[in-house]
């Protein structure tokens, strides 16, 4: 049984706990702020938000902002559903208010769809009002005269809200602009015409409709800078000349090797013929002896042949060139 002396303290403690729980589950001051702002919402609805794990401090300020901006068609249930789907309620309401003030057509369904697709819908609306400037990386291209040009461009784009869901992003814009610059410079007769009229590149690229299928609308393309690079044509000609020279040297080396091989083959054949001659000369004494035995060769015939051999040897010695050793001529 509770002592009478402790009863006031228990009642005070219970009252404090009740007040804390009440203000936790029922944000009274938030409800009061909504009432003052003209937003119709009950304490029961705020309590049910807590039960559904929907923070009232996200939904109610968004409702107040929409009501003050004249967007009375946005309901509490729609905001709760968008929050529970993982969306950003504050950004969606900010975007709708900005679009309404800028006379941009944007419905709640479109805004929530853009937000759930992972796009920043508020930034998209801001970009529709204030176009964004994108600087392209250096684009390298070669004119028909072989001179390399390095161009930098600035692309002014505006968000196309209707294409934000499923439309390509900035990377696609940069890639298409770079492709257009390369095509424009590559079709120029010489690099001087590009340097004299850089706006011709912008006009040609804009006519191609590079923003088709993207989340942006290209407003202008301005060539910020053009630098002259290497002489690619001359470099290619030098490389081709070096390649032709290497091929000619390889063919000449091949012909030289074939000539050396043929020379060695001829030397081998000459040595073979010389060996055959020596072998045939070795058979001469045998034939002469056989001729003496058979009586086909007489003594006078033998001496006559020896005289002929001596004359032949003398002529060969006379015909041989003299070699010198120091100042003394030597005969082999």
Swiss-Prot record:
Pfam families: FloA. The keyword Transmembrane applies. It is a single-pass membrane protein. Keywords: Cell membrane, Membrane, Transmembrane, Transmembrane helix. The gene is floA. InterPro entries: FloA. The keyword Membrane applies. The lineage of its organism: Bacteria, Pseudomonadati, Bacteroidota, Bacteroidia, Bacteroidales. Belongs to the flotillin-like FloA family. The chain crosses the membrane at residues 9-29. It is found in: Cell membrane; Membrane raft. Found in functional membrane microdomains (FMM) that may be equivalent to eukaryotic membrane rafts. FMMs are highly dynamic and increase in number as cells age. Flotillins are thought to be important factors in membrane fluidity. NCBIfam families: PRK13665.1. This is Flotillin-like protein FloA. GO terms for cellular component: membrane raft; plasma membrane. Homooligomerizes.
């Amino acid at each position: 049984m509770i002592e009478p002396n402790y009863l006031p303290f228990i009642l005070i403690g219970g009252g404090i706990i009740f007040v804390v729980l009440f203000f936790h589950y029922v944000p009274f001051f938030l409800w009061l702020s909504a009432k003052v702002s003209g937003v119709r919402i009950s304490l029961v609805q705020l309590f049910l938000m807590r039960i559904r794990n929907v923070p009232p401090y996200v939904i109610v300020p968004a409702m107040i902002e929409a009501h003050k901006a004249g967007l009375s068609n946005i309901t509490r249930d729609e905001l709760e559903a968008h929050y529970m789907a993982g969306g950003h309620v504050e950004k969606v309401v900010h975007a709708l208010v900005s679009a309404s003030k800028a006379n941009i057509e944007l419905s709640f369904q479109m805004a929530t769809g853009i937000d759930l697709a992972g796009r920043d819908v508020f930034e998209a609306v801001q970009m529709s009002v204030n176009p964004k400037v994108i600087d392209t990386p250096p684009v390298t291209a070669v004119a028909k005269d072989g001179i390399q040009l390095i161009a930098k461009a600035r692309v002014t784009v505006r968000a196309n809200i209707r294409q934000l869901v499923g439309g390509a992003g900035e990377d696609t814009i940069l890639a298409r602009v770079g492709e257009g610059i390369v095509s424009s410079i590559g079709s120029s007769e010489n690099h001087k015409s590009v340097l004299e009229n850089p706006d011709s590149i912008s006009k040609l690229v804009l006519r191609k409709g590079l923003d088709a299928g993207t989340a942006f609308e290209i407003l202008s393309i301005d060539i910020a800078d053009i630098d002259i690079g290497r002489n690619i044509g001359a470099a290619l000609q030098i490389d081709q000349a070096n390649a032709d020279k290497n091929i000619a040297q390889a063919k000449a080396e091949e012909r030289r090797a074939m000539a050396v091989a043929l020379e060695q083959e001829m030397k081998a054949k000459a040595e073979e013929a010389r060996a055959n001659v020596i072998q045939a000369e070795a058979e001469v004494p045998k034939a002469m002896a056989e001729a003496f035995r058979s009586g086909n060769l007489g003594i006078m015939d033998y001496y006559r042949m020896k005289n002929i051999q001596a004359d032949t040897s003398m002529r060969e010695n006379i015909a041989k060139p003299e070699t010198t050793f120091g100042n003394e001529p030597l005969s082999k």
